[in-house]
Amino acid sequence: MGHNPVEPRLGSLDNSGDERDREQTMSLYVAALWRYPVKTLAGEQLSSATIGPDGVAGDRLVRVRGPEGVRTARRQYRLLGLHGTLSADGTPLVNGYRWDSAEAAGLVKSAGGQDAWLEPADEAERFDVLPLLVATDGAVAAFGRDVRRLRPNIVVGGVPGLGETEWPGATLQIGRAIVRLDSLRGRCPMTTVDPDTLERDPEVLRDIGRRFGGRLALNAEVVRDGTISVGDPITITWDR
C-alpha cells in the first residue's frame, strides 16, 4: 500500500507533549475492513464501507436463534463454517442463499442444531458490546494467528507492538468519519476455532489470557459517519 509506519516514541498518555509526538510519528492507515451480515457466522472482507451509529452498514442484520435464545458459535462452533455476505440489494445471504430461504435454514440447522433458525437481529442485542471492533496490526502480529479469529470490523495498520493497549479513550479520524475507542475487548471461545478447518484449540484462549490479559482489539463507536476505504490514512488524537 506504500505505507511505511514509523516507530513512535512511547511515553505517558498524561503528557500532552508525548501525545503530540505520537500523532506526528505514527503513520496509521486502514489495513482491512470486515462485515458480518449474519451475526456469529464468518464475515466478508471489504474494500470500502460506510460507517455510522450502527457500525459498518449491513453488519449483523440477522442472527441465529434457538429455543433458549440467541445462539452463537461460542458453543455451536460449526456456525463459523458458514459465510454471511450481503447481496447487491442489501439482503443478507448465507453461503450465497437468501437468509430467509429454505437452503439457508437447512445450512444453519446443520451447523447450529436442528432447532436453530434465522431471524432479523433485535436492536437491543445486535452487538455484544459496541457497534465496532477495531484491531491493530501490531497486536495481531503479536497474537500470531489469523486475524479472522478476532472478528474485527477495522484493522488499523502502522501500529507498533501492543500500542492499542494505550488507545482506550482516543479517537480515530478516517476522512470525514470519526471513531471513538472505548475499551479493550475481552475475548471468548470463538477465538479458539480455526477459521478454515474449524478445529478447536483451547490453548488459544489461554494464550490470550496469559499474554494479553484476556483482551485484544478495541470496542468502538462511530461519532461521525462517513465512507472509509482500505488504505485511507488515519489520525489518532487523545482528549486527555
Regions found by a protein language model. Name each.
Residues H3, L10, D14-R240:
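Metal-cofactor-dependent catalytic cores
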